[in-house]
């Protein structure tokens, strides 16, 4: 086995988590995130295409994509928690997300998930975060 193969076997991507902080009103709190794998990303993208049957006019729903990324890749807090949804008076994770976070906070969390999923320039910083 090559050194790269050994590294990849010893460092599977299914157990990576990273704690991050956002700015503004949430600067004192940590969110725990997990990266997206290729299958998840493909599924989210397919769910976010508007007019999928129309060959001429297809649109991508960025807001829905960000919501799916955050709901499914933020470990803490858990936006799928039924007790939290009930206490917030909502029925879905999407409704909870939009009740407790601002649009920019949702976008920022989605961006952070994308970064730890291998998209972005700061791979050295992410490697340090993963080690901690």
How should these model regions be labeled?
Residues 1-13, 123-132:
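Low-complexity intrinsically disordered segments
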Residues 13-15, 57-58:
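A general, composition-driven signal for non-globular sequence regions
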Residues 14-27:
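Short acidic-hydrophobic surface loop/beta-edge motif
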Residues 15, 33-35:
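Long, low-complexity, highly charged intrinsically disordered regions that are enriched for acidic
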Residues 29, 36-132:
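Short, surface-exposed, charged amphipathic helix/loop patches that serve as local interaction elements
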């Amino acid at each position: 086995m090559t050194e790269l193969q050994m590294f990849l076997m010893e460092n599977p991507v299914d157990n990576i988590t990273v704690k991050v902080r956002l700015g503004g009103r949430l600067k004192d709190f940590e969110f725990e995130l997990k990266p997206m794998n290729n299958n998840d990303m493909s599924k989210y993208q397919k769910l976010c295409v508007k007019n999928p049957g129309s060959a001429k006019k297809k649109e991508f729903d960025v807001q829905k994509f960000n919501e799916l990324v955050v709901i499914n890749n933020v470990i803490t807090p858990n936006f799928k928690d039924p007790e939290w949804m009930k206490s917030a008076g909502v029925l879905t994770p999407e409704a909870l997300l939009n009740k407790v976070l601002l649009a920019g906070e949702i976008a920022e969390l989605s961006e952070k998930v994308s970064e730890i999923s291998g998209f972005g320039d700061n791979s050295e910083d992410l490697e340090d975060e993963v080690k901690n």
